[in-house]
């Protein structure tokens, strides 16, 4: 009898979701209007996001440690910012792929995913009904102990995705680099804010004042207190800082 009970318990555990992982319906979401229907943003966690526009779904940096992807919608488009394990997860990508899913990644991901399109900094393409721009993402200030940047120039991408008339910038792992500060006509921005890999709240505020997104979401912020960023931009009424749970 005890052996049968133990066997039943092992079977239940084998088919149970990994502790801590969440499925659709448990994440925070925002809905923004576009010229052709609403854009729904799902805040998965850390640097991982999902965008839904009509029937089309875009996943950015899907990683299995942030979600149970067997319970999330399949992807029409997957964007990967760089090769680090908290951004690139081939198993999560495989779970989300359909026959016609497009997978786009930065140069540092080449050879790590099958069937991927590599986009260099500065490239643009129309993918799955959206215009996508790959923009630089790198460190200039924060370095490893041997003096090399955590994210070297040219390895990683940020992405600007145009959903009809709404331009959404997902910065990836980067600092407040000149290319970021020169961006124009950004409606929604996701800027990373954790040390030593990306930016301080002061660096994020500096970048936001330069390119002036209408809505700014800090993400990838780890243990950094996002209220500091809210305070820094408190005198910028045209930039709405929205803090969401990112796991």
Set out the residue ranges of the language-model regions.
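Core dinuclear metal-dependent hydrolase active-site scaffold
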Residues: 24-73, 115-184, 245-247
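A short acidic, amphipathic alpha-helical/loop segment
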Residues: 91-96, 179-182, 203-207, 228-232
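Active-site metal-binding motif and surrounding structural segment of the metallo-beta-lactamase
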Residues: 64-111, 184-190
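Proline-aspartate-enriched helix->loop->beta-strand connector
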Residues: 186-191, 195-218
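Binuclear metal-ion centers of metallo-dependent hydrolases, dominated by the metallo-beta-lactamase
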Residues: 117-128, 153, 205, 209-247
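Bacterial N-terminal signal peptides
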Residues: 5-17
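Sec/Tat signal peptide C-region and signal peptidase I cleavage site
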Residues: 18-22
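Active-site environment of divalent metal-dependent phosphoester hydrolases
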Residues: 66-68, 84-88, 110-112, 123-126, ...
């Amino acid at each position: 009898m005890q052996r049968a009970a133990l066997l039943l318990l092992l079977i239940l555990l084998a088919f149970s979701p990994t502790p801590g992982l969440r499925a659709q319906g448990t994440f925070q979401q925002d809905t923004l209007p576009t010229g052709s229907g609403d854009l729904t943003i799902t805040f998965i966690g850390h640097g991982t996001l999902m965008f839904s526009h009509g029937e089309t779904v875009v996943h950015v940096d899907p990683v299995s440690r942030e979600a149970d992807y067997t319970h999330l919608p399949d992807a029409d488009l997957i964007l990967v910012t760089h090769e680090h394990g908290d951004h690139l997860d081939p198993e999560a990508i495989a779970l989300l792929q359909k026959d016609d899913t497009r997978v786009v990644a930065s140069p540092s991901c080449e050879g790590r995913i099958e069937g991927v399109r590599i986009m260099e900094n500065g490239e643009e393409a129309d993918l799955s009904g959206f215009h996508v721009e790959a923009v630089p993402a790198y460190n200039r200030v924060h370095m490893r102990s041997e003096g090399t940047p955590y994210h070297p120039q040219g390895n990683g991408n940020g992405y600007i995705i145009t959903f009809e008339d709404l331009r959404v910038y997902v910065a990836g792992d980067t600092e407040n680099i000149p290319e970021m500060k020169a961006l124009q006509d950004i409606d929604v921005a996701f800027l990373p804010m954790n040390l030593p890999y990306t930016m301080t709240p002061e660096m994020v505020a500096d970048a936001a004042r330069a390119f002036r997104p209408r809505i700014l979401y800090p993400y990838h912020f780890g243990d950094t207190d996002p209220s500091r960023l809210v305070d820094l931009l408190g005198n910028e009424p045209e930039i709405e800082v929205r803090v969401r749970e990112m796991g």
